[in-house]
Amino acid sequence: MTKIIGIDLGTTNSCVAVMEGGIAKIIENAEGSRTTPSIVAYANNETLAGQPAKRQSVTNSTNTLFAIKRLIGRKFDDKEVQKDIKLAPYKIVKADNGDAWVEVDGKALSPQEVSAQILRKLKKDAEAYLGETVTDAVITVPAYFNDSQRQATKDAGKIAGLNVKRIINEPTAAALAYGVDKNSNADQKVVVYDLGGGTFDLSIIEISNVDGEKQFEVLATNGDTFLGGEDFDLRLINYLADEFKKESGIDIHQDTLALQRIKEAAEKAKIELSSALQTEVNLPYVTADASGPKHLNVKVTRAKLESLVDDLVKSTIAPCEQALKDAGLSKADVSEVILVGGQTRMPKVQEAVKTFFSKEPRKDVNPDEAVAMGAAIQAGVMSGAVDDVLLLDVAPLSLGIETLGGVMTKLIEKNTTIPTRASETFSTAEDNQAAVTVHVLQGQREMATDNKSLGQFNLTDINPGPRGSVQVEVTFDIDVNGILNVSAKDKATGKEQSIKITASSGLTEDEINRMVKEAELHASEDKQKRELVDQRNQADQLIHTVQTSMTSLAQDQQTELKTLIEQLKMAVNGSDKAAIEMRQSALQEAYSKTMQTEQAQSQQAAQHQGNAANDGAKDEDIIDADFEDVSNG
């Protein structure tokens, strides 16, 4: 059976893993790292994903897309998107369907398309490691992701050429990676404290023993989608810039190249201060003014960094309190606290978590890799490689329809274990009503207008009758991925209408297919570019070989080869692979013939010398003997 990979599609970094020999193994990317920056850049008609995109992020900020996960499956008018518009250096625009898209070089791109670039890179890295084509994946999402965001994540997978077998919640995946389900047969309440690069997610999970198998249920979620390690970096960047300004009088924020260097140095210093008490940020020639080059040299202590980010760490505690309250639990009810996300390596963060929960948090799994490992374990469950886990997630928000008076009537309550199905019968609101509009909603508020609209459809041609006499059965059906299907049926006639909730916020099937084709086209272009580079490299190697070895050749032979070399160099400077191949073949053929001729002449000369030597040797073999005449005559 082909492998199913597990993917953590993160806001700041992403990660891919696979089950091997019953163990979840993280797959390194082409750059040799175990995590890949969730960054996509568009530069010089080329699309960069991961570390190459990150390296040029400051100098090409308007065309470098990061934290795109904050936009996926969201409407442009959402308050979270409006906040992002003020912070993001790239342009966020309103799509025709009201979704939040981004614009690069005048072209509108959906977050699904951009996320697909990251997924495609992870897919490619997995294929390089496994030595086989990968088509199936399990992808994780935050527990609070609504139906639109989950569907959009699946669409991103499809555009990347992946069949998304399952969408699972990140905290559930982390709990699987930590093996919390193996610790005890008793029911457990586990807190997952996930402070990543761009978001903070706090989840409380209940792990129950159901007929010898473990059931995972998310009891509560909370957090801040605009708080993460990047905010910690920013505090240190601003501190370094302020110190530099005090020293030199130069505002480094105006120099994008210098700012890129400071950004990288700040991130490195922050990481170092998780294990060291002091570090030094030393950037020679960081910028210059009329008086000459300037150098940045600042000592930073752990205590200083902690004072800079103290309020950020404290701000993670309120969501912990709220989640406990929502779950109806006290701190004493918590069995374990597990840490996820790179920022949880910071000692001050660990101390804050320990102080609040009065419990030492678990940190025995790499926090950057835990979610991807959990996704790989779930992939193993689906492929049959793992057989002792039963994974049951829950609906993150209540689902229902709009009824008389603009009220939301809930059919599926928040935190209901999925997959699930619920039906309820409604009656017509007016006499002789010939059609019923079913308006599907998601949220916790009482009034329809205060909740998120997921879509609507009409059940037409129902039998007219007095108000309340026509019975319409509405059924909500959520699959294991949290994707919702809604149907309405006239009980008298059996006439039925249904909708798969995708169109309200997301891409149409035609749009997805177009993006898949574009992705395939880019894959083809990428392949052609790579083949062109390989051809150029081969040509350069041949040129070097010929130039090195032709110095001993006759002048006329050298002249012919030099002409062919110049022709090949001209072809290499162009972009026509066929032309390079043709010129390379011509040079190779001429060089081979010349070398064969040279070799034949060398052999003849050697043979001639050998023959002459042999003749000389024969003469030398004749021994002049002295004969003594012994005859008596």
UniProtKB/Swiss-Prot annotation:
SUPFAM superfamilies: Actin-like ATPase domain (SSF53067), Heat shock protein 70kD (HSP70), peptide-binding domain (SSF100920). Residues 599-615 have a biased composition (Low complexity). Residues 595-633 are annotated as: Disordered. NCBIfam families: PRK00290.1, prok_dnaK. The lineage of its organism: Bacteria, Pseudomonadati, Pseudomonadota, Gammaproteobacteria, Alteromonadales. Residues 621-633 have a biased composition (Acidic residues). Acts as a chaperone. Gene3D superfamilies: 1.20.1270.10, 3.30.420.40, Actin, Chain A, domain 4 (3.90.640.10), Substrate Binding Domain Of DNAk, Chain A, domain 1 (2.60.34.10). This is Chaperone protein DnaK 1. The modification Phosphothreonine is found at T199. PANTHER family: HEAT SHOCK PROTEIN 70KDA. GO terms for molecular function: ATP binding; ATP-dependent protein folding chaperone; unfolded protein binding. Belongs to the heat shock protein 70 family. The keyword Translocase does not apply. Induction: By stress conditions e.g. heat shock.
